[in-house]
Swiss-Prot record:
Entries under InterPro entries matching the protein: Acylphosphatase (IPR020456), Acylphosphatase-like_dom (IPR001792), Acylphosphatase-like_dom_sf (IPR036046), Acylphosphatase_CS (IPR017968)
Name of the protein in question: Acylphosphatase-2
MF (Gene Ontology): acylphosphatase activity
Source species taxonomy: Eukaryota, Metazoa, Chordata, Craniata, Vertebrata
The encoding gene: ACYP2
Main function: Its physiological role is not yet clear.
Organism for this UniProt entry: Anas platyrhynchos (Mallard)
Amino acid sequence: MSTLGKAPGALKSVDYEVFGRVQGVCFRMYTEEEARKLGVVGWVKNTSQGTVTGQVQGPEDKVNAMKSWLTKVGSPSSRIDRTNFSNEKEISKLDFSGFSTRY
């Protein structure tokens, strides 16, 4: 087996922050629901700056699908201006057993 490239099913972790009208519009609830549908783990929470922040972990294709959702979809009443992603990296194991809302 080649050590070059990524192993099939490689796990990925990424932090995110979503800007726009994302508080008071059930954004966290919909984020949690979408994460469970996709089978990714992590967390989501509101910030005092009016943004939503969190972390997503899982198979690379599922994390990429969640990144797309956090950038383009959101909750029905939200308005996403931009989403910043940081600390994107490959991981050897998941740090969470599910997806939760933090307060």
